[in-house]
Each structure stands twice: as structure tokens, then as C-alpha cells.
């Protein structure tokens, strides 16, 4: 899905452009990813978040 609304991480300003109009930095998508109870990659995201390596 293509998101239209974007946010500058430095200025906390919302825009529709890929770069911030004030500071010129790259904007990010402020929306969280969708949740699925049947997510195959949940353990890898938890591993990245906690900084722990899980041996599969």
C-alpha cells in the first residue's frame, strides 16, 4: 500500500513530499505496519527489537 502522508523526523512536520521543505532531510512514513495474528516473521522483529540473536 502506498502511503501519501509523510513526516520529517527532525522537524516533526507532516508533508506529502519525499523530502522536508524546511530542512531538506528525507521524510518517513509515520504509520505502523499492519498486524496479522498469523505473522511468520514476528520472532525476527522481536529479535531485532531486543537485540537478541535467536538460533533457528
UniProtKB/Swiss-Prot annotation:
GO terms for biological process: pseudouridine synthesis; rRNA processing. It holds the Pfam family Nop10p. GO terms for cellular component: ribonucleoprotein complex. One of its GO terms (molecular function) is snoRNA binding. Keywords: Ribonucleoprotein, Ribosome biogenesis, rRNA processing. InterPro entries: H/ACA_rnp_Nop10, H/ACA_rnp_Nop10_sf, Nop10_arc-typ. Involved in ribosome biogenesis; more specifically in 18S rRNA pseudouridylation and in cleavage of pre-rRNA. Belongs to the NOP10 family. NCBIfam families: PRK13130.1. This is Ribosome biogenesis protein Nop10.
Amino acid at each position: 500500500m502506498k502511503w501519501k502522508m509523510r513526516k520529517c523526523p527532525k522537524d516533526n512536520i507532516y508533508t506529502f513530499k519525499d523530502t522536508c521543505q524546511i530542512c531538506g532531510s528525507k521524510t518517513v512514513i509515520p504509520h505502523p505496519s499492519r498486524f496479522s495474528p498469523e505473522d511468520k516473521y514476528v520472532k525476527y522483529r522481536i529479535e531485532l527489537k531486543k537485540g537478541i540473536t535467536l538460533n533457528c
